[in-house]
């Protein structure tokens, strides 16, 4: 959205969750009471799941195009600490990231972008050229970019039901298992 706004487009960001500050309060409420807001929590809301993660910024090790550098420089321009530009494992804490996300949103709005929070895409109507929001409101659009993360199963189901072509993203899961050396030796050497 930020790049589109910089290029003169007026992106409309439709977010099923809350704005980042409201989301922070919703997450704190969950941690204190155990009461979950299904659309504003550690997974859903402005900033995505990474906002409430351990703060590590995953870097593109083989990024010969310099995209990662651009992202880090953009974060710094919106208030992230400069050391993320040279640290081997850059890190931004949640409190700082909330300020960065909010500053980016404000800049996108200054450039003509628009944000709709608590607005879930519940249907896509390609023939009409519109999205359905919260099962009621229709928004006309010429192009749609979905950045829904992996937890929006209801949205994936809607896309599947609509016949949208999708493919699973490959991923790997690592497991570390420790065994006594004697057991390893016995299994290896008899």
Kindly label every feature range from the protein language model.
Residues 1-190:
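Residues forming the flavin
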């Amino acid at each position: 959205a930020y790049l589109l706004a910089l290029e003169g487009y007026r992106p409309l960001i439709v977010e099923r969750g809350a704005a980042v500050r409201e989301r922070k309060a919703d997450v704190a409420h969950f941690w204190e009471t155990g009461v979950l807001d299904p659309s504003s929590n550690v997974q859903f809301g402005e900033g995505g799941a990474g906002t409430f993660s351990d703060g590590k910024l995953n870097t593109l090790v083989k990024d010969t195009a310099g995209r990662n550098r651009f992202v880090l420089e953009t974060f710094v321009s919106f208030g992230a600490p400069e050391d993320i530009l040279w640290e081997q494992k850059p890190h931004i804490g949640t409190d700082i990231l909330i300020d960065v996300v909010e500053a980016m949103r404000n800049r996108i709005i200054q450039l003509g972008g628009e944000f709709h929070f608590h607005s879930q895409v519940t249907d896509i109507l390609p023939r009409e050229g519109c999205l359905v929001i919260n099962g009621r409101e229709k928004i006309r659009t010429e192009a749609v970019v979905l950045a829904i993360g992996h937890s929006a199963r209801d949205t994936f189901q809607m896309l599947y039901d609509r016949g949208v072509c999708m493919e699973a993203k490959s991923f790997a899961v690592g497991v570390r298992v420790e065994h006594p050396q004697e057991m390893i030796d016995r299994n290896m050497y008899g």
